Structure formats: structure tokens, C-alpha cells
């Protein structure tokens, strides 16, 4: 039904995650420098009226791009290290409010419409980790959608003493062979140079769900397109 309601951050795991947090924090300073220094070089050369060759300009642009991706990846890894370890105190939260908040934080493109059926249910957990969970799952759907517009459907129901949530989109979907791998940190189905994504979002989602004693998985869907992600969370007041 569910695993014990515990934190993943214990013993050696806690030490490893503290190291990850410190390491990513320090590396982010280097990544920001890598993003800024090419601009300084360009400004200095412009002040001296030096015109860069096309190849040199492309190389500087490439350096900025890779530095930006590195910074995004380090930010995502920092968020992963914070789950459970730096969590807010557990409390009861209105599921509809959590989902609506995540929907408002989605990027403007693609334009996704959120349909919610939360049934007035409440869940128990740290607010910051629950926000990370819904941002990760809904954000993953937006990041990989292949159209300018689409739909997200979030349905919740009671399940024993817990609340089961299913998030479905109408994007391109994922082949069943990859349904497990996508929850691993830094996992992407295409090269990061093509997608621009860190591959950490669903790893964050899995860590939050497991820290709250649940499980998360991709489930089969009868729709011709799309993906459905299902997970369970501790209910509040008997799940309602």
C-alpha cells in the first residue's frame, strides 16, 4: 500500500546529499562566471573596435549556451538535494490549491489548459516539497509537449488512507521501454544539447513521493497521444 512516512535523508544518504548541495552551490558560481565573461570579452572588443570573425562569435555564443545549460542543471540538482532534507514542517494542504498554483507557474509556451478533478481532497506533507512535486510533473509535461497548445488533466481520488493523483497530458508520450529510466537523475531520451532540459524533474518528483511513503509511475493510457503519471500522497483527515 505504502512505505513508512520517512525522510530519505538519513545517515550516509544525508551526508551525500549535503555534499551534493555544497558542490552544486559552489559550481553555480563558476557557471555564472562562464555566462558573464563572454559578455565582458565582447564588450571589451567592441570598445576597441575589434570585429570578431564569424567562427569566434559562434564560439562565444556556444560558451554562453553551455554555461546556461550547466547553470540550469546545477539549479535542478540543488533542488533535488533539498527534497526532504530542507523540507517545511508537514501540514494538511488543499490539493486543488497545490495543483492550481503549479498550473499558474507553467511557462507561457506551450499554452496548456489545466483541467482539475480534485474532489475537495487534502494531502499531508511539506509545502515546499509538494510544490516541487507538482512543478516537476506538470513542468515535465510542458517541457516535452510538441505543440503550441495542449491540455493537462489532473484527477485525484482516495486510495486507502492516501490520495492517488493522476496527471495526464496530450503530448507525444514516452515509449514503455523508457518508463522507468525517466525517473533517474539526469535522464533524457534525447541529447541535452537538443532538448535543453536537465533531466532532473521527474527524479525530484520521485524523491518527494517516496519521502512521503508513496510511489510514482507512468501508467498505460488508451488515448492515442499523451502520457499519464500516477502517484500517491498521505491523505489529511482520512484523505478528504
Describe each PLM feature range.
Residues 169:
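Acidic ATP/Mg2+-coordinating residue in the GHKL
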Residues 151-161:
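Short beta-strand/loop element within the Bergerat-fold HATPase_c
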Residues 214-215:
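Conserved glycine-rich
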Residues 201-205:
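Short alpha-helical Gxxx[C/S/T] motif in the catalytic ATP-binding
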Amino acid at each position: 500500500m505504502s512505505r513508512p512516512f520517512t525522510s530519505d535523508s538519513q545517515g550516509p544518504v544525508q551526508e551525500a546529499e549535503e555534499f551534493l548541495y555544497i558542490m552544486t552551490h559552489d559550481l553555480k558560481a563558476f557557471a555564472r562566471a562562464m555566462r558573464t565573461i563572454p559578455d565582458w570579452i565582447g564588450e571589451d572588443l567592441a570598445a576597441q573596435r575589434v570585429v570578431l570573425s564569424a567562427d569566434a562569435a559562434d564560439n562565444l555564443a556556444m560558451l554562453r549556451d553551455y554555461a546556461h545549460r550547466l547553470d540550469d542543471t546545477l539549479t535542478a540538482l540543488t533542488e533535488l538535494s533539498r527534497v526532504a532534507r530542507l523540507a517545511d514542517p508537514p501540514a494538511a494542504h488543499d490539493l486543488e490549491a497545490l495543483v492550481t498554483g503549479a498550473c499558474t507557474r507553467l511557462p507561457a509556451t506551450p499554452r496548456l489548459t489545466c483541467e482539475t478533478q480534485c474532489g475537495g481532497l487534502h494531502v499531508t506533507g511539506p509545502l515546499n516539497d509538494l510544490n516541487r512535486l507538482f512543478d516537476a510533473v506538470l513542468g515535465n509535461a510542458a517541457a516535452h509537449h510538441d505543440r503550441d497548445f495542449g491540455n493537462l488533466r489532473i484527477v485525484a481520488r482516495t486510495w486507502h488512507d492516501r490520495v492517488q493523483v493522476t496527471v495526464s497530458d496530450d503530448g507525444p508520450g514516452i515509449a514503455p521501454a523508457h518508463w522507468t529510466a525517466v525517473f533517474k537523475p539526469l535522464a533524457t531520451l534525447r541529447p541535452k544539447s537538443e532538448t535543453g532540459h536537465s533531466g532532473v524533474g521527474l527524479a525530484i518528483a520521485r524523491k518527494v513521493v517516496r519521502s512521503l511513503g508513496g510511489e510514482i509511475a507512468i501508467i498505460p493510457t488508451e488515448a492515442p497521444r499523451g502520457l499519464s503519471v500516477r502517484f500517491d500522497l498521505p491523505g489529511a483527515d482520512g484523505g478528504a
